[in-house]
Amino acid sequence: MKVSVLLVCLIWFKVNFSVPVEDLDIFAEEVVQNEVEKGNFSNMPDNIRRIPRGICMNTYECRIEGGKSYGFCALGFGVCCVFRATCKQEVINNLTYFVNPDFPDLTRGMSSCSLKVKKIESEVSQIRFDFIHFNLGQPNRKTGICEEDVFKITGENTTKDLIICGMNSGQHVYVDVENIDELNVEMTLSKKAVSRIWEIIITQVSFSEGSPPGCLQYFTGRYGTVQTMNFADNGRHLANQDYNICIRQEENMCSITYEPCHENAFRISPNSEDTTINTNLLAEGSGDGESDDLRESFRAIEMCNDRIILPCDTEELIMPGMFNLAPGSCNLIHCGLSLCPSGNDPCKIESSATPFNIGVHFGNSAKPVSPEDNLGMCLNYEQIPCE
């Protein structure tokens, strides 16, 4: 019996996961409670009770690789090994927590922070960043540009760097690494007395389990909520954002509805003060007015420097007192202070266009505008079964 146990221990090897965070089969027994100070972070709860995610491996490997064991896994032959990294360190595992130096306390007085993320194997095509906590300084309130605190993800051959700031707890992003070996996370922090906290789960994802091409964010499930970056009561949508939010079409689902999370959940002011144009443009797909509709489409694009794109082929607006829309009506471009035309809230937009994608296109916002009119977007979605 002793020989058998010894043999099992000698041949025990690390279980290697390369799947999205929500699908990880995680083993952990210790509950971690962080007391988080209030202040600029009023959207965060006082007490956070959470079981950390980790990789099931033997105790020796966990210790040698710099991890910390949190309970047992694999019938007691392994431990749930949790890896944490902070500034000026490297990530060399497929699941690592990147935290501020004083975590779980707030960090003050830093000017910079950097992290390298090494791809662990050639099959990894994307790196997923889950912002469990992400509270940095706000962008310029009038322009939306991240001027003081900047969080940037770069790679040698990446086509575009991700740059964000502000409050992004609960958000996530996928970054393609198919043709590169490492990513760099660079944070530039202002010298102002701003309290900051971040806790980011970094996961390495194989090609078969990642997001579709061109999707910075990827949501699954019949129901869910999507938001633009830095969407908060005292926030402002960020400038220079150009990406797609993608939603997986679930089995036996043929269409999707979008509804603002609350009455102020869609506020993206247009460039012009001209109110004679409906920025939530109703453009007929065919008919005698097609040329006029095309001209109006270009005018809407010109007006909406900051805009949301909801692709559609047959779209229905469901609003109180509005039942006379022609078949095939399509609201492609959305900006202004309401998701629906003429401010007829509450409303739902239903679309059968696939894939279920939302385009976020925010310009450089060189012209100062009211931050209250540029909170950004928060939408609840629901997929509708096929008839």
PLM segments and residue spans:
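Domain-level representation of secreted and single-pass membrane ectodomains enriched
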Residues: 2-387
